[in-house]
From Swiss-Prot:
Pfam families: Asn_synthase (PF00733), GATase_7 (PF13537). GO terms for biological process: amino acid catabolic process; asparagine biosynthetic process; cellular response to sucrose starvation; L-asparagine biosynthetic process; response to absence of light; response to fructose; response to glucose; response to sucrose. This is Asparagine synthetase [glutamine-hydrolyzing] 1. NCBIfam families: asn_synth_AEB, PRK09431.1. InterPro entries: Asn_synth_AEB, Asn_synthase, Asn_Synthetase, AsnB_N, GATase_2_dom, Ntn_hydrolases_N, Rossmann-like_a/b/a_fold. Keywords: Amino-acid biosynthesis, Asparagine biosynthesis, ATP-binding, Glutamine amidotransferase, Ligase, Nucleotide-binding. Induction: By dark. Down-regulated by light and sucrose. It catalyses: L-aspartate + L-glutamine + ATP + H2O = L-asparagine + L-glutamate + AMP + diphosphate + H(+). GO terms for cellular component: cytosol.
Length: 584
């Protein structure tokens, strides 16, 4: 992930202002250590910190159209850029960067081109012909982005809060699936799929449709000009990503450049569930597996850095971000610049253990909708910023637009958890990849129970965090918590501890308002807490809080596999510019 910063219409074109923009842009250099760029046109500034993943030699930013009247700075990957270039035959491209198409698409179609992009992105585009600008963020919010306003009438854009919090009177999270246009004078929603209105869909479950859609999502993300790998915890989601990647890597441009054997990475405390399962899956798939161990003290020592980089005080996010943060540093030290990760499946398929309590399919579906819409505040934030802290890019195939639309059009009855019928959480996904003739995964991995990342790395990790917080936050501090922190008042010592650190780095009221709050149990939304009366007094975000559902063992012995597996899909047509895509 790159880092972008823009200051637009600040009524100051002085050298001092340029120096200030450069200074603020350097706060984002961890995201893009490969190159820095700054474009100035009057009182408009576009800065870029580049992580070179596509076309490292010539793709430096900002990028331009032919006559350089349109300028764009982008953080993202446009997976269909080759297809889009074919639609822009009258345009001359200067680089091989996937992001250059944005300037030309705007020139050809105006502001409404954003839905044509298939990828993850945040960008700022300046049209010097009339001094107008637009800003856009991807559909789900995989890339992080903030918008702020100065007292001088300026508009500020930054990949991270730390790029603008000291210079803006007010700032907020830029909403996913929207663009902001100076011509329109505000935001416009460009991503509005049918499932957004939360009405219950009725498409029958077709396992092969799910399989094809997800394989396509993984394959298109193999577009890279640098070494890459997969994050492999040994759970269902990361294991499927690894399995599909391993199957389709051969013959791609990436394999020709970096070799056909996939590298996988796992992190955990000694003896943790993830380390054991990750190693087993890696051996099954034949990956070059890298296992990273950390201690509870290692994690505690990193908490301040994690909060500074991830920019949140949300308990669940910090718990899970810390091991990912530590692992990302190790991965980058090996020369890897991009990883595939498994975020998003639990939101789409109702994979969290509390979904066992969903009273009906309408409630189940509406909760998945709420969870997906909030992903940019939680797992997307974690995956993006804990990796970007070390100049590592995370790609998340479960959050592919086409795949989400396929999965969210299903009748939610098929997603509901019914253990008596052998249907555990994410059953429809497991069933889609249960192939007897060409198995994707061993059965007990395919049907391994859900572990939240912060649990799977080792149960003593969360217990250690709670103990450490208790040593730093006393009862008197908790009794005054509502006065000290009237917004999102911390209700545990662990939450109070994180909040104190956050406020040191980001003391502005705008900053604290960017962090979500409300009742939760086992990662639920506040609405889902109503599903079980016993949850109202148990506000632990850990998956273990789903009392009566969580199994500490993960060997699959408690799962009834009563559903016959699918037959292999033979002789499916495949095509892709740099690899293969399975056509539906």
């Amino acid at each position: 992930m790159c880092g972008i910063l823009a200051v637009l219409g600040c009524s100051d074109d002085s050298q001092a202002k340029r120096v200030r923009v450069l200074e603020l842009s350097r706060r984002l250099r961890h995201r893009g250590p490969d190159w820095s760029g700054l474009y100035q046109n009057g009182d408009n500034y576009l800065a870029h910190q580049r992580l070179a993943v596509i076309d490292p030699a010539s793709g430096d930013q900002p990028l331009f159209n032919e006559d350089k009247t349109i300028v764009v700075t982008v953080n993202g990957e446009i997976y269909n850029h080759e297809e889009l270039r074919k639609r822009l035959k009258n345009h001359k491209f200067r680089t091989g960067s996937d992001c250059e198409v944005i300037a030309h698409l705007y020139e050809e179609y105006g502001v409404d081109f954003v839905d044509m992009l298939d990828g993850i992105f945040s960008f700022v585009l300046l049209d010097t012909r009339d001094n107008s600008f637009m800003v856009a963020r991807d559909a789900i919010g995989v890339t992080s982005l903030y918008i702020g306003w100065g007292l001088d009438g300026s508009v500020w854009i930054s990949s991270e809060m730390k790029g603008l919090n000291d210079d803006c009177e007010h700032f907020e999270t830029f909403p996913p699936g929207h663009f902001y246009s100076s011509k329109l004078g505000g935001f416009k929603q460009w991503y509005n799929p049918p499932w957004f209105n939360e009405s219950v869909p009725s498409t029958p479950y077709e396992p092969l449709a799910i399989r094809r859609a997800f394989e396509n999502a993984v394959i298109k993300r193999l577009m890279t000009d640098v070494p890459f790998g997969v994050l492999l915890s040994g759970g269902l989601d990361s294991s499927l990503v690894a399995s599909i990647t391993a199957r389709h890597l051969a013959g791609t441009k990436a394999a020709k450049q970096w070799g056909p054997q996939l590298h996988s990475f796992c992190v955990g405390l000694e003896g943790s569930p993830d380390l054991k399962a990750g190693k087993e899956v890696a051996e099954y798939l034949g990956t070059v597996h890298h296992e990273f161990h950390f201690s509870v003290q290692d994690g505690i020592d990193a908490i301040e850095d994690v909060i500074y980089h991830v920019e949140t005080y949300d308990v669940t996010t910090i718990r899970a971000s810390t091991p990912m943060f530590l692992m990302s540093r190790k991965i980058k030290s090996l020369g890897v610049k991009m990883v595939l990760s498994g975020e998003g499946a639990d939101e789409i398929f109702g994979g969290y253990l509390y979904f066992h309590k969903a009273p009906n399919k309408k409630e189940f579906h509406q909760e998945t909708c709420r969870k997906i819409k909030a992903l940019h505040k939680y797992d997307c934030l974690r995956a993006n910023k804990s990796t970007s802290a070390f100049g590592l890019e995370a790609r998340v195939p479960f959050l592919d637009k086409d795949f989400i639309n396929t999965a969210m059009s299903l009748d939610p009855e098929s997603k509901m958890i019914k253990p008596e019928e052998g249907r555990i959480e994410k059953w429809v996904l497991r069933r889609a990849f249960d192939d007897e003739e060409r198995p994707y995964l061993p059965k007990h991995i395919l049907y391994r129970q859900k572990e939240q990342f912060s649990d799977g790395v080792g149960y003593s990790w969360i217990d250690g965090l709670k103990d450490h917080a208790a040593q730093n936050v006393n009862d008197k501090m908790m009794s005054n918590a509502g006065h000290i922190f009237p917004h999102n008042t911390p209700n545990t010592k662990e939450a109070y501890y994180y909040r104190m650190i956050f406020e040191r780095f980001f003391p502005q009221n705008s900053a604290r308002l960017t962090v979500p709050g409300g009742a939760t149990v086992a990662c639920s939304t506040a609405k889902a807490v109503e599903w079980d009366a016993s949850w109202s007094n148990n506000m632990d975000p850990s998956g273990r809080a789903a009392i009566g559902v969580h199994l500490s063992a993960y060997d699959g012995k408690n799962v009834a596999l009563t559903i016959p597996p699918l037959k292999a899909i033979d002789n499916m047509p495949m095509m892709m510019g740099q690899g293969v895509v399975i056509q539906s």
